[in-house]
Amino acid sequence: MRKAKPKKRVILPDPVFNDQKVSKFVNHLMYDGKKNASYEIFYAALETVKAKLPNEEKSALEIWKKALDNVTPQVEVKSRRVGGATFQVPTEIRPDRKESVSMKNLILFARKRGGKSMADKLAAEIMDAFNEQGGAYKRKEDMHRMAEANRAFAHFRF
């Protein structure tokens, strides 16, 4: 066991929207310390989203936040050994982990899309998530389905 819980680092808000969530997302998107490239990709993706959904009364940032909410899981399954058998125990997810998992899934499935630039792939995944479709949304649904199927083992909580 560790002595003390590590302090949470303060993440500075992004320069355009002044939002910490955007900064966190860009940090997940970043490769090799290239944060400016990540910001460019993210902002280009939001521009594309706004261009593709012109009749939507929400701003591109609000669409992105709604898409994130749509792919945020509420429960997950964790493996737990009990008497030689391994059970998939459904557990609720901490709020900070919910946010992190949803961002990582959105980025992962955007990267898996074929062809085009990363900005286009991210924009497509954001629009799919906004419309409750796409890989990231499917991953959330699968997590919930697994938790529901293993509900009988919920009394093995950690």
UniProtKB/Swiss-Prot annotation:
Disulfide topology: none
Example of a GO biological process term: ribosomal small subunit assembly
InterPro entries, sorted: Ribosomal_uS7 (IPR000235), Ribosomal_uS7_bac/org-type (IPR005717), Ribosomal_uS7_dom (IPR023798), Ribosomal_uS7_dom_sf (IPR036823)
HAMAP family, per database record: Ribosomal_uS7_B
Subunit note: Part of the 30S ribosomal subunit. Contacts proteins S9 and S11.
GO cellular component annotations of the record: cytosolic small ribosomal subunit; ribosome
Protein known as: Small ribosomal subunit protein uS7
Keywords from the named record: Ribonucleoprotein, Ribosomal protein, RNA-binding, rRNA-binding, tRNA-binding
Domain of life: Bacteria
Gene behind the chain: rpsG
Annotated function: One of the primary rRNA binding proteins, it binds directly to 16S rRNA where it nucleates assembly of the head domain of the 30S subunit. Is located at the subunit interface close to the decoding center, probably blocks exit of the E-site tRNA.
Classification via Pfam families: Ribosomal_S7
GO MF annotation terms: mRNA binding; rRNA binding; structural constituent of ribosome; tRNA binding
PANTHER family referenced in this protein's UniProt entry, alphabetically: RIBOSOMAL PROTEIN S7 (PTHR11205)
Family per similarity comment: Belongs to the universal ribosomal protein uS7 family.
